[in-house]
């Protein structure tokens, strides 16, 4: 159970940038990310998606989407993220709490659509599989290759 890729965007709708390491701050999220220190709703600190879901989507629909296509911050491998909603877990040395499923929107559907798959089909396929939103409970660094564990 590891972090495979790390992305952030400096502004909403801005280009995604890939990093090997990111600094995350408790209650604020990823330093430099578009949602850093966003207030109002729980789960805005950081988002995660399973690499396997994107790979399965590509295999099912014959597409070639990159792992950044969902615009989630962390791309994981070997962990079923939906099982982490309501639980605390550790990535590297950072403690997180899964807040909610990050359900797909029509914007994501449109961005992943192709001649072979409609936006509505994208959304339908990704329901309950498009990742999770999490709160950052402790500050630290997350790096590609970082291991996951369930908090005790």
Write out the residue ranges for each language-model feature.
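Metal-cofactor-dependent catalytic cores
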Residues: 1-152
